[in-house]
């Protein structure tokens, strides 16, 4: 009888130790994931501030804005530049011509 109870207790202790070890590993992986995610967000310029300066509404596509980088901001055909910007035609390669809106001061 004592032997049966001892084996049950031993199995229960082993199970609890494995469960605790697994839980600890999961927490460590989550911490590593959070650190990696935070590092990636920082390197991409994301400040992790709650939607400051952003609108919940859909963006207004009635005019073409100024590009933030060299490859972003190509205006679709027929769309005019937003106020304070002027349309500049640029050439890429031999046959590709596209329009970009830049500040009127340039």
Swiss-Prot record:
Residues 1-20 form the signal peptide. The keyword Transcription regulation does not apply. The lineage of its organism: Eukaryota, Metazoa, Spiralia, Lophotrochozoa, Mollusca. Evokes contractions in the radula protractor muscle, and may regulate feeding behavior and gut motility by controlling muscle contraction of the buccal mass. This is Small cardioactive peptide-related peptide. One of its GO terms (biological process) is neuropeptide signaling pathway. Disulfide bonds: none annotated. It is found in: Secreted. Keywords: Amidation, Cleavage on pair of basic residues, Neuropeptide, Secreted, Signal. Expression is seen in the peripheral and central nervous systems in tissues such as the brain, the inferior buccal ganglion, the gastric ganglion, the olfactory lobe, the peduncle lobe and the optic lobe. Expression in the brain is distributed in the median inferior frontal lobe, the superior buccal lobe, the prebranchial lobe and the pedal lobe. Not expressed in the vasomotor lobe or the palliovisceral lobe that controls the cardiac system. One of its GO terms (cellular component) is extracellular region.
């Amino acid at each position: 009888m004592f032997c049966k109870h001892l084996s049950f207790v031993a199995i229960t202790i082993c199970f609890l130790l494995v469960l605790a070890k697994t839980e600890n590993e999961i927490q460590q992986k989550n911490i590593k994931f959070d650190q990696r995610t935070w590092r990636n967000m920082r390197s991409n310029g994301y400040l992790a501030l709650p939607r400051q300066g952003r609108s919940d509404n859909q963006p207004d596509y009635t005019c073409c804005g100024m590009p933030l980088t060299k490859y972003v901001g190509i205006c679709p055909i027929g769309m005019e530049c937003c106020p304070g910007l002027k349309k500049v035609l640029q050439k890429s390669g031999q046959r590709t011509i596209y329009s970009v809106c830049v500040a009127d001061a340039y």
